[in-house]
């Protein structure tokens, strides 16, 4: 890889379980680029490495999401130490955010953070996500909020991120962006898909003025929440959407699994 970012094939040096995690995470990076959610070299997605060591995989700082491969991912521990042989750097803000969630949430095997225009726009709206679309109400059931503290370089912020997120699977970081977590790459992508689509719909709808919008009441929000269970989301993601997303990726942006 040009400009100092090397990508040596590591498949033969890691376990089969880690390799599967690497392939899924590289696919998730490329899908993020394919859907237009990337932010040049900024933002990050991580995946816990199966096993007892509490390591996780994250992108090498400086590599575009569309370039990501299974072998190029960096393995770090919860102290921020790189534990595989690589010269790559890790975005320190990315480490703060992702290590916070991985340390606190055993179920958060994958953590995804993006800075889309619409996601940031909604993060800056005092009312947050509104119940104005079916997609929005599905996302709202799992959303928490975290106030902006500046670029996430202070490791002490990890405790506050975790406290604000609680047991939710989605986090809107005020004036900053969005975050999703899940037990798999597919589940995490699907959760982010609903949140980002909801943000786009909201930004467009608000162009008519909030006073002209139909906001669904609490009872209707409860109905939608009951119809969109976490188990249903996982099945929808892992069994139906993710295989299709990989087929799409193989057609349009192959090479992630190297």
Put a short name on every predicted segment.
Residues 14-19, 84-92, 143-152:
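Flexible, glycine/proline-enriched loop segments at strand-loop-helix junctions
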Residues 47, 56-58, 145, 172-173, ...:
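Short hydrophobic-aromatic micro-motifs
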Residues 100, 121, 144, 156-164, ...:
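Non-catalytic alpha-helical scaffold/packing segments enriched in small hydrophobic residues
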């Amino acid at each position: 890889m040009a400009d100092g970012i090397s990508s040596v094939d590591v498949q033969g040096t890691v376990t089969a379980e880690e390799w599967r995690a690497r392939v899924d995470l590289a696919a998730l990076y490329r899908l993020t680029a394919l859907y237009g959610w990337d932010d040049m070299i900024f933002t990050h997605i991580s995946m816990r490495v199966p096993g007892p060591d509490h390591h996780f995989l994250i992108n090498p700082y400086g590599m575009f999401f569309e370039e990501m491969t299974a072998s190029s991912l960096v393995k770090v521990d919860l102290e921020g130490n790189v534990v595989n042989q690589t010269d790559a750097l890790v975005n320190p803000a990315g480490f703060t955010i992702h290590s916070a969630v991985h340390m606190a949430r055993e179920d958060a095997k994958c953590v995804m953070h993006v800075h889309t225009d619409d996601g940031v726009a909604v993060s800056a709206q005092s009312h947050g996500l509104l119940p104005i679309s079916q997609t929005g109400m599905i996302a709202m059931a799992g959303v928490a909020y975290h106030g902006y503290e500046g670029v996430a370089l202070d490791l002490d912020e990890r405790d506050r991120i975790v406290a604000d997120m609680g047991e939710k699977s989605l986090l809107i970081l005020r004036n900053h962006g969005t975050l999703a977590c899940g037990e798999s790459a597919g589940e995490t992508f699907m959760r982010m898909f609903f949140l980002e689509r909801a943000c786009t719909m909201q930004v467009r709808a608000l162009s008519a003025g909030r006073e002209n919008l139909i906001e669904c009441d609490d009872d209707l929000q409860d109905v939608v929440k009951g119809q969109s269970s976490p188990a249903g989301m996982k099945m929808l993601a892992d069994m139906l959407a993710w295989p299709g997303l990989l087929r799409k990726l193989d057609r349009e942006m192959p090479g992630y699994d190297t």
